[in-house]
């Protein structure tokens, strides 16, 4: 808040909203969303302003011991929220329904849109796969990274699209696609990591802060 005249309170700048704000003498489009499941904003700005805005944020945050974090940390946190990413969980290999994006699709819209016909056909064909979040048990020295096979009773029934360790919840996680009949919460599956198979349970999406309290705080 020290960097901008725009009020950043929940009342003035709520979750899932956006505004153009000033940051020092820089300008950015601020979106009250993020990819890590915490209270925060995405800042979209001209590339020539990037170093200045970054430096201003770091200086303003010194009293709070602010520190940058890397892409691996961000990936770990997005797994804990079951956030999909292109081209891993969202790909031309499978439909938006298979990626678990049903709530963003309205096939009954009166207007046409790109992909509507293909989406209707994918529904008629019935989804072959469903998106799942997996908790991997008993793995101590390696986590899934993506493309690992997922099995049921020794039969290959899907594959991981992403994986890693969730440090906020202290669990090894994977996102993936499995045959629809094996996608129910509580289903016990296996995943092969570096030649070894581990128990992988289907769990609810967003094992970290499932009600989004932090995002809306």
Segments the model singles out, each with a brief description of its role:
Residues 1-217:
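Conserved, structured C-terminal
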